[in-house]
Design a protein with these regions (language model features):
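Flexible, low-complexity segments
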Residues: 25-44, 96-97, 180, 210, ...
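Acyltransferase loading domain of fatty acid and polyketide assembly lines
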Residues: 1-21, 91-93, 113-121, 200-201, ...
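FabD-like malonyl-/acyl-CoA
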Residues: 1-109, 147-157, 161, 166, ...
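Short helix-loop capping/hinge segments that flank enzyme active sites or metal/cofactor-binding pockets
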Residues: 183-213, 308, 314
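Structured core elements
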Residues: 48, 95, 116-118, 127-129, ...
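Short Gly/Ser/Thr- and Asp/Glu-enriched loop/turn motifs at secondary-structure junctions
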Residues: 89-91, 119-125, 153, 189-193
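Short amphipathic alpha-helices in soluble, non-transmembrane regions
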Residues: 107-109, 135-145
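Helix N-cap motif at beta-to-alpha junctions
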Residues: 100, 130-135
């Protein structure tokens, strides 16, 4: 059980980054933010996620109930914790400022499956996962060649052969989840459920396919975030007729254009701001589309400020926000009419006096 005091501890004394806590806490926070945005009448047209971020994305899409989403996250933390303590060879992960194609020759210098490209974050950013000694050796090589690299604060080599040791156990623990397709969503609510673009496949995924085996692939397989986000940007409207997995046929010769105007990151920090900007800038059409990016939360910044800043960006894009709910959230007294302040200082129109 998570003690509330754990969050308030100094980072070096807190176990919040331990997988037994971090997986569940992060997903719970993301789900809460999804519900908060819905209460403000903010509904996405499409969603995608990076690694475990897909769990909350599936919840936002209506594929997973809150109970099932939290089960997927909790048991992910359980098996990761088990691997952390029982693994014969310690694992690690490292962010590298190269493309998957550029970094592969470096990985080929090691034994097969010792190091893998775990995440393709953007055209110029990947995450490498594997044996800790190999990670350290690769880091030194890249440092010598003045290539950016940074070890991540994780003790498990996610999205690598290391995870295969707990894959079947994870599947058995989450085998009870029941993903919901559009046929299980009432007719009046279907239009508000977003499309789900998978970073496991890089394509749109029908909601009913987000079953237990999918979440095993999400834990073990490569994260194709750059591909899934790019696909989302171009195919949101073309697929909007129905989230059934069937692609709407394009008119012959029709030019593919970006179909989104704003990307919102939902999580404890703007962790994907760099990769997202790199994805948008690397594609001429996406770069020209001037797609806005905002994060609901930013580390060491007041959460009210960042959340309302995100709302302000959406307002500037003419999105219909429910200001009544924002200004008078649930739990406040109802029936009280806001009072107009009439005794505040008047605006100074006389600017003839000089002060400097």
């Amino acid at each position: 059980m998570l003690k509330t005091g754990e969050i308030a501890k100094h980072p070096r004394d807190s176990d919040l980054n331990h997988p037994s806590l971090s997986q569940t806490v992060c997903t719970a926070l993301q789900i809460a933010l999804v519900d908060l945005l819905k209460s403000w009448n903010i509904y996405p047209d499409s969603v995608t996620g990076h690694s475990s971020g897909e769990i909350a994305a599936a919840y936002a899409a209506g594929a997973l109930s809150m109970y099932d989403a939290m089960s997927v996250a909790y048991y992910r933390g359980v098996v990761a914790s088990q691997l952390l303590h029982d693994q014969p060879n310690r694992g690690a992960m490292m962010a590298v400022g190269m493309s998957a194609e550029e970094v592969q020759p470096y990985l080929d210098e090691f034994q097969p499956r010792q190091l893998v490209v775990a995440c393709i974050n953007s055209p110029s950013s990947v995450t490498i996962s594997g044996d800790i000694l190999a990670i350290d050796a690769l880091g030194q090589t890249l440092k010598d060649q003045q290539v950016f690299s940074r070890r991540l604060e994780v003790g498990v080599a996610y999205h690598s052969p290391h995870i295969e040791q707990v894959a079947e156990q994870y599947h058995s623990l989450i085998g009870h989840i029941q993903p919901r397709g559009l046929d299980q969503i009432t007719e009046d609510k279907r239009g508000k459920w977003p499309l789900f673009f998978s970073s496991v496949t890089g394509k749109m995924a029908p909601l009913q396919e987000l079953h237990a085996r999918y979440w095993v692939s999400n834990l073990v397989g490569q994260v194709k975030f750059a591909q899934s986000l790019r696909t989302l940007c171009f195919e949101t409207n073309s697929q909007r007729g129905g989230n059934t997995g069937a692609t709407r046929i394009r008119r012959a010769g029709a030019a593919q254009k970006p179909s989104v105007d704003c990307l919102i990151e939902i999580g404890p920090h703007a962790a994907l701001s760099g990769p997202i900007n790199q994805i948008l800038q690397a594609d001429a059409k996406l770069n020209a589309a001037d797609i806005a990016y905002i994060s609901i939360l930013t580390r060491k910044t007041n959460a009210v400020t960042t959340a309302l800043g995100a709302v302000a960006t959406l307002v500037s894009l003419n999105y219909p926000i429910d200001f009544g709910t924002i200004n008078r959230p649930a739990g406040t007294k109802k029936g009280r009419t806001p009072q107009l302040l009439t005794n505040i200082p008047t605006y100074v129109w006389n600017h003839t006096r000089s002060y400097w």
